[in-house]
């Protein structure tokens, strides 16, 4: 059997960059990682609770964290910032205060910035959320996959592969189904491929969604 490496880790330093930028002593390293995870989870939960989203898509592509001695800079790359920024200054301040309270950090300031991304459906995380929303609403998995591919084609990408695994359409035996459109060169390190794996709970059990999007090739 072929062993499949994570496409993001495989390309770190060439076409992919780290989402956390900071240094720590080896003994404090695990604390830093846990803190990052806490920040990311808190922001995602906050957005889920405070924004009424009809499509079920929160629209977070990624959250970057940069740390200095006295400052934690968090950049949220979001596809639909209007939902979050309807009364912008108050909401961002509220989020900053809540994160600071959650982390219980006295001598470090937290600064949260929001960056809008063009072509939100060209990002696998947002696309996976869209598919998850469709599956929760009992839309057929094939229909959800095809709709996702249509959305990606509008975002001007070179190729996409979508895989859904689990009890598809409530069948008793779990299986994996996938669909590919265009080129997805997973073995080419110079190819910029965005990847996401996402878990969704449905009434039939847990389904796993994996998405590979071929964005561009490094010349």
UniProtKB/Swiss-Prot annotation:
GO MF annotation: an example: structural constituent of ribosome
Protein family (similarity comment): Belongs to the universal ribosomal protein uS3 family.
Keywords, comma-separated and alphabetical: Chloroplast, Plastid, Ribonucleoprotein, Ribosomal protein, RNA-binding, rRNA-binding
Oligomer and partners: Part of the 30S ribosomal subunit.
Source taxon at top rank: Eukaryota
Record's keyword annotation contains RNA-binding: yes
Gene that encodes the chain: rps3
Any one biological process term the GO annotation gives: translation
Domain KH type-2: 47-118
Pfam families reported for this sequence: Ribosomal_S3_C
Main location: plastid
InterPro entries: KH_dom-like_a/b, KH_dom_type_2, KH_sf_prok-type, Ribosomal_S3_C_sf, Ribosomal_uS3_bac-typ, Ribosomal_uS3_C, Ribosomal_uS3_CS
Protein name: Small ribosomal subunit protein uS3c
Any GO CC annotation of this UniProt entry: chloroplast
Keyword hit for Ribonucleoprotein: yes
Subcellular location(s) of the protein: Plastid, Chloroplast
CDD domains associated with the record: KH-II_30S_S3 (cd02412)
